[in-house]
């Protein structure tokens, strides 16, 4: 697909064995953590660089199909009012979280961004993330899966009661 910045999988099977009946929760937690790393940053990625908030506001998530929601703010509006751009980015995060909560084990989950310059940001256009942010999160997928699985086990989520 044109513009595809990566496809990845992580092995969740060992955690599924430790979390019987909780495979959906494991997939949801993993997917949300990857999204958070890409959009806002965290342990593995600095997140999408933010000036006006437009690039962060353009993230969208979907389950089973590439999402096609239109951006909630234009580049011009975000540049004129960065606070509105950041608010739109927060809304994009909430919209994606809502989509991820519908995911089931085995579903394909998509993250997309329609900002014209997202690829340039990923490949060093911004001094905020010169080493990228998408690839850093994707390259850490297994570590993220292991952290989410360990967190759920620690919380005592051993299966449906």
Residue ranges of model-derived segments:
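Short, low-complexity, charged/polar segments at coil/turn and helix-coil boundaries
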Residues: 10, 14-121
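Short, intrinsically disordered N-terminal pre-domain segments
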Residues: 1-14, 161
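Globin-like tetrapyrrole-binding proteins
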Residues: 124
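Protruding loop/beta-arch "assembly-hinge" segments enriched in small, turn-prone residues
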Residues: 127-161
